[in-house]
């Protein structure tokens, strides 16, 4: 079936490639940094013929007669560019790309400065960042690694490719941060289709909101939200890449789109495959070889049960830019994952061998978007996803192993086996979690005029879950639980744009509804019949907030935002997940937080060939009923294989600041630096202390330089250098007030360095890149002190067809 799907995609693209596109001009309009400029004007002078670029900055002009023509491109706030092109018999399909430089114009006494999507998002008042993926798509970089370079964002990963990931925004992590794909909660897609596996080439841009989340996302997050915006597919293109590197890591992806100009019929498809042995070197207190007499010897060894594979794809058919829809798509998303498990929550003395997880998902999706729906100013968008997800936990190997990768030998010289018959002490299992999942995101907005806009949004997500286990009898399976979790989040927002666009205000309210239903078959009191023990919870909550910005001068913008945020417990926190060693907690309650951000943005200052932008944000969070691990010495032990999320008694407070600097010179040199410093405190054993397992001080820096016409005319060489710093932090509270020996719980200070280069060949359709990660092979640790891979090398080939 997988091979048939791949062949079908191949023939579809080959057929599309053969279409006749004679007499057609295509291309893109971007700023000098390569960021798309939507709705730029492209006109052929003398023909009274022109178009506007789409949301991705691409344009197409058809039926252009033979001969020479002058093409003029303009965009408010940017300089006008013109080029002469020629349509002739041997070259009827011409591609022309434009880069526009930012300018400041004065129209009737009003200063107008062009804004890209990135600038517009980051100056609305929210503590927000827009991350472009254009350069990262050409390199051997995962989407998570790209996020990790962003100010205030820290990726918490339990190992190498495919390992469990948590996203930390200003110190708040886990389910406190919501992740979306085009506004749909990513949890709907399951572990086999996540940011570990989705390559940057599938992504248009990433929006990061810290602390305060706008109403249109309808999110139940107290830490913030990350919204992955996929490419819309308004331009004929095909992109294929393959990357290979250390640890036998292979990553491939194929994505493309075809649009019939006359009918608007559009096809989008993408596919990916990732694999890694993840057999990197590790060391530490618990990494030991155990002799038959029980003597433990510290060793440096390789992980040996940590391979990862994921395969998936998405295909959509529909129409774009037609009279009845800006976008209409129906499609399918399919994914499959295999993930070996090396250890439990902590890196314990006894590693796992033979324990692995398998996941798959098959989901249908529908998208409809239309501006000026029925009446001018009324915009509508609806996205729906429905499908099935399965996860199998396979743990049937009883043999005990040491970190040397060999069998554990007993006093009698014979290999040992665990008495419980599996790697995990809970006993052998082939547990299956089957889920029916659904989510619908709908939104209406009405623009009264240039100053006032109202938005109404609703997000529904539901999970119907059924557990079973092939390793237990049919009778025992009748006692497996069934679980349902439903969420509704409704938001109403008002946007004000006043004083010649100097003041922007976004005020919103949110209403949250959650229903939990758990059915557990049990024997009645006299053990004569099986009855259903039902737990049901129906609760609703209300939150609200605002964001505001004021332009003091064209280069100084003040920003502030605040929200009373609610975070509803997630499915795994409520029902548990044996694959992640999580125990259920049916009575867990939502957590709440009062969040506030105050900051400013300076720039962009253009000083001849120099460009400088500086932004900073001060933030505070007051979290009550916090959901977390019982991270004190009595409630959480390193020997624990299972953990349970619970509501922690004491309030937590997060206060800190973040700052970011961008510098560019002559569009060739780019430098960025960001810093984030905070205190995240609570009370433990009567003493105020920092919340464990949370990095409090991080810095990132990046340097890029571009050589044009390197070796070959019209070629480009880009060099990249990045460095990452994380200060030491504890992953557990010390026992009581006595801090003697607490260094055992410290994750040490860490600095790592990456280097990369990409070479674009003259026709811009072939790119070769090379990356070195963790150049100096430093020991890097992360979530709960799990060590991450050392130095690694990767080579990537990209082939791009921008028009066919």
PLM regions and their residue ranges:
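Short, acidic, small-residue-rich periplasmic hinge/interaction motif at the N-terminus
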Residues: 30-32, 40-43, 74-78, 88-137
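Membrane-embedded beta-barrel scaffold of Gram-negative outer-membrane proteins
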Residues: 559-563, 591-647, 653
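Extracytoplasmic beta-strand/coil segments of soluble accessory domains associated
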Residues: 144-185
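Gram-negative outer-membrane beta-barrel transporters
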Residues: 512, 520, 613, 617-622, ...
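Short acidic/polar hinge/loop motifs at secondary-structure boundaries
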Residues: 62-63, 184-210
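N-terminal periplasmic accessory domains that precede
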Residues: 93-99, 143-146, 163-168, 180, ...
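C-terminal beta-signal and adjacent terminal beta-strands/loops
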Residues: 566, 619, 623-629, 719-740, ...
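Face-selective signature of the C-terminal outer-membrane beta-barrel domain
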Residues: 316-321, 325-336, 359-528, 539-545, ...
